[in-house]
Amino acid sequence: INIKDILAKLVKVLGHV
């Protein structure tokens, strides 16, 4: 798992909110 993947996921979740 890459850090970028995690950050991208967090950004996606936060962006969804």
From Swiss-Prot:
It is found in: Secreted. InterPro entries: Bombolitin (IPR012534). This is Bombolitin-4. The modification Valine amide is found at V17. It comes from Bombus pensylvanicus. Keywords: Amidation, G-protein coupled receptor impairing toxin, Mast cell degranulation, Secreted, Toxin. GO terms for molecular function: toxin activity. Its main location: secreted.
